[in-house]
Amino acid sequence: MAERQKAVAKQEKVTISKRDPWALKKWFAVHAPPYLGGVFLAEVPATEAEKLLMRTLEVSLYDITKDISHLPVKLKFQIHRVEGLRALTRFKGLELSRDYVKSLVRKGTSKVVAITEVKTKDGMDMRVSVMVITAHRLGTAQKSAVRKKITETLLKKASEMDTSQFLKEVLEGTLAADLFIAAKKIAPLRKVEFAKIKVLKYPPEEERVVVKEAVAEAAS
């Protein structure tokens, strides 16, 4: 009898060890931040909610807006909170595709890139790269003047907005339009684009929420 029980226990152990690990996972719906309407981005699997925290997801802005002109805009979001089977994200970065950037630079024009670190009103630090395409070729002095105007305007705008408003205006094109208006007084322009954005530091309040979530998940 004892031998039979041992055999059954051994068989159960083998069955459990051979179980498909995917059967233990749950599917979580990942959503964009509120300023993008909290739209659904993707589904990701995980055995525990805490394992999703800090995971990064890359999508095109087109996936959110369904605007074909947004296909070259690549966005990175980071999961920072989980509520049930909903994974909530925060912005992590933006970058234009290389092919798109190359297509903008034509003969007889100039590309001016302004790179600066900005801080929003609520304490978000970002490194921002703005690309300006001019209507005709510029000299060194004009390029410097355009770069300076873009940098000054961007720093001022960022300091007057909280993170959500700043990113919303970046993604909607409102902020690029403001930069265009400011810099066209120096030279004729054809286009202004946010080429790259990288988050350097999140607002203190947002970081506290992430830490709190991680501690709560670890304790549960």
From Swiss-Prot:
GO cellular component terms?
ribonucleoprotein complex; ribosome
Record-linked SMART domains = Ribosomal_S3Ae (SM01397)
Under the heading Pfam families, the entry gives: Ribosomal_S3Ae
Q: What is the top-level taxon of the source organism?
A: Archaea
An example of a GO molecular function for this protein is: structural constituent of ribosome
Against InterPro entries, the record matches this protein to: Ribosomal_eS1 (IPR001593), Ribosomal_eS1_arc (IPR030838)
- Alphabetically, which GO biological process terms does the record hold? translation
State the UniProt keywords alphabetically.
Ribonucleoprotein, Ribosomal protein
Family stated for the protein in its record? Belongs to the eukaryotic ribosomal protein eS1 family.
What name goes with this protein? Small ribosomal subunit protein eS1
User: Which organism is this protein's natural source?
Assistant: Pyrobaculum arsenaticum (strain DSM 13514 / JCM 11321 / PZ6)
This protein's encoding gene: rps3ae
